[in-house]
Amino acid sequence: MSVDLVNNPPHYSAFGFESLELLEKVFNLMPLKNMIFYIGNALKYSIRSKFKGNEIQDLKKCEFYIKRCSKLISEDFKIFESKEIMCYLTKISEKDFKLFLLINDIIHFALNPSQRNYNAVVNHIKKYIRERI
């Protein structure tokens, strides 16, 4: 049986769900739609980081895209939570708790794009990368 690297690459379903499902749930709740591209890429690179073959490079790409959000931050949004998103995060936490914490911070920032949350996620990414070098 061959692996379909176009329609179902294994590094995007390594946590037991297709990562696009999580991204779509997050995008639907994001108050700043102009951050979707950056957040989507940050989540993509963080989710696949342990499974694609170059973890540090993927984590640095994640950091790059989060930093692109800095000019789009606003302080005028309410906190969002989603039971659907928590189901995906639970699956990630069961396999890799530290990566879950990072992805959770990225999603928290995506749904609540404040300077405080931006600073927290940037610091978390840097720390996560340092732990892996």
Task: Spell out what each predicted region is.
Residues 1-133:
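Intrinsically disordered, low-complexity regulatory regions
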